[in-house]
Structures are given as C-alpha cells and as structure tokens.
A protein has these predicted regions:
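Conserved SAM-binding strand-loop segment of SAM-dependent methyltransferases
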Residues: 65-73
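Conserved Class I SAM-dependent methyltransferase catalytic core
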Residues: 51-53, 106-165, 172-179
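Flexible, glycine-/basic-rich loop-and-beta segments that form/coincide
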Residues: 166-262
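Amphipathic alpha-helical repeat scaffolds
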Residues: 87-91, 130
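Non-catalytic, mostly N-terminal accessory regions of nucleic-acid modification and defense proteins
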Residues: 1-14, 77, 161, 223-319
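Class I S-adenosyl-L-methionine
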Residues: 1-62
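A short acidic, Gly/Pro-enriched loop at the edge of an enzyme's catalytic core
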Residues: 77-87
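Local beta-strand N-terminus motif with an aromatic residue
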Residues: 20, 82-83, 153, 174
Length: 319
C-alpha cells in the first residue's frame, strides 16, 4: 500500500479522535499500516490478520507489540464489537471466501472484508478501507444496502488509477471508504446505495456524482479486457498527497472513546494453556481469555457476544 494512502487514512482517523483503543488490520501483509502508525495513536492495541505465512511471520518479527494471527480472515477467531477502528487495503478480485456465517450473501472478497469487519468493530467505530471501485459502482445495490443498514458512510475518496502504479505496477481505480458503525440495524436506503450518471454520461455511484470534490481525477470510459469501463484518470501535474489531504479535511465524524479496563500498560495476560488452540477463546476461573501464541489475554465483550462465545466454548469442550 503506498505510504501516501496510509498517511491519508491515519490523518482521517486522527481528526475523528482516534488516540487509543483496539485497532484491526485484516490482510495486513508485512505490516505497512503498523509501521506507519502515527505517534498520536501509539496507545492503540494493534491486531492484524494475514493469510500468507511468510508475510505474516515477517510482520510478527517487525511489530512484536502487535497481535498478528497468521491465518485466513475467515478462520480468525476475533470477537465481535471489539475494535474501535479498522484500517487496510483489502484484497480485490472476483473470488469468494468460504465463511459459513456470511456465505448466504455471496460476496466477492473485497465486499466480504467490509461486511465481516463491520461485525468486529464497536458501535461508533470506523472502518477505513481501500477497496475496489466495484463496491461503490456495481449495478447491484445489495452490498451497499447491507452496509448502509449497519453503518453511516462518513465519506468516500475515489483514487486515480495510477495510485498503485509505483508500488504494485497496476492501473486500477479504487476507493477509500470511511464507514461508521450504527448501534443497531436500520431499514434505510440512502442515495449512495444507488448509481447515477454524471454530466458526461458516466454511470457511477451517486455519492461521487454529488461530491465531485471527492473524485481525485477525471472520470472517463476506457476499453478493458471486460469491455468498456469507467476509470479515474489522474489530473495532470497534480500532487496526490495534497489532493488526499484536502479530501480528508471534508470528512466529519467522532469515534467514541471507551474506558480501558485496568491500569494503563498493565499486562493482565497469563501463560498459554497448551490444550487451548492458538487464536481461540477459553475460560479461566470464569474469565474469558483469547490465546495469542504463548500468552492468553483477557477480553471484555458485550454481554450478548460474551454469552455466544461462552456457548461456543462449552460446545467445543464437550466434543
């Protein structure tokens, strides 16, 4: 992920008040977001998930204070409503992830990461993900309606298709989405669930038609391997960092702060029980713990989530 995009995401979260709490990065790779965590967020506890074992092990070595699960996101045992924010550059592609909890939605991989992560953050928490423009621009509104019922779109930034050229050698139009989780599901269908047509006849998400200042380039139609498709061409001689900074300044939200349990910096973890599978929950003396490698850390969960986790532990332990 280009540093200029990581900086912009952290700039947005900083102005939303994120200074501490739990921060999640699914598909963390070797930990570029972790490495660029600003000083103002050093009190955050950072959690990562990475499928690739080499990248995941590198991230663990580089960022030993972070908690990194080297496994697929679909297999990571991460509690619901636990994180204050989530960041990342999620995988794009026309592939689907097998995850029993979400299979009924038939999501492509980038939409799966958005939908699942909404369950992992607290009400009021914010997701800041780079995703394929397909999430916002696909004809079917189903994914956007699902997200809108569970989160408020703080804003979206359409990136020029050269944003990843230097780092990945690809010309791809992508978006940064900023979503703030609702405290309950609402039957709502805001404008951004649907598409519209701009003044040049290009069909795209209605949010970008109504907010052209959040499109950091010129939208145009171009021939691709899949036929004609819309692309965001970069402005000539424009500095992407400046454009991003200006766009981010227009994002307005406040991430609520939750009281941290226990004295600051106190390590309440205990040595791992070898009979407890790595990256899974267990109960010790009536208290919930989550095993990460050689330690088990206490976790505080909302009551309904805690009851579900305890039920799963009981079911697991009796089989």
């Amino acid at each position: 992920t280009p540093p200029v995009l990581i900086d912009a995401i952290y700039q947005a979260l900083a102005q939303m008040g994120l200074e501490s709490g739990n921060l999640l990065e699914p598909a963390c790779g070797i930990g570029n977001f972790m490495g660029m965590l600003p000083d103002s967020m050093r009190d955050c506890k950072v959690y990562g998930v990475e499928l690739d074992s080499i990248s995941g092990r590198i991230a663990r070595q580089l960022y030993q204070n972070s908690r990194i699960a080297v496994t697929g996101y679909e297999k990571a045992e991460i509690p619901d409503s636990f994180f204050d924010a989530a960041v990342g550059n999620v995988p794009f592609g026309n592939i689907k992830v097998v995850d029993r909890r979400y299979d009924k939605h038939h999501w492509l991989i980038h939409d799966y990461f958005l939908g699942k992560t909404l369950d992992k953050i607290r009400p009021g928490g914010v997701i800041a993900f780079i995703t394929s423009k397909g999430t916002m621009d696909k004809e079917s509104p189903a994914v956007r309606k699902y997200l809108a019922q569970r989160a408020d779109l703080i804003g979206a930034i359409r990136l020029p298709n050269t944003a990843f050229k230097a780092s990945a050698g690809t010309d791809v139009t992508s978006d940064i989405l900023f979503l703030q989780k609702r405290d309950r599901i609402v039957d709502i269908e805001p404008d951004w669930v649907h598409l519209d047509t701009d003044e040049n006849g290009i069909r795209m998400n209605s949010y970008f038609v109504r907010h052209p200042e959040m499109v950091l380039g010129e939208m145009a139609m171009e021939s691709t391997q899949y036929g004609m498709d819309s692309v965001c061409k970069p402005y000539e001689n424009a500095d992407l960092a400046d454009l991003l900074s200006e766009a981010v300044s227009g994002l307005h939200a406040q991430i609520p702060t939750y009281e941290q349990d226990g004295p600051e910096e106190e390590d309440l973890s205990i040595p791992a029980d070898p009979n407890v599978r790595n990256y899974s929950f267990t109960s010790v003396d009536g208290k919930l713990y989550f095993r990460i490698d050689s330690r088990m850390e206490p976790v505080e969960l909302p009551l309904t989530t805690e009851n579900r986790v305890r039920g799963m532990i009981a079911l697991r332990d009796c089989t």
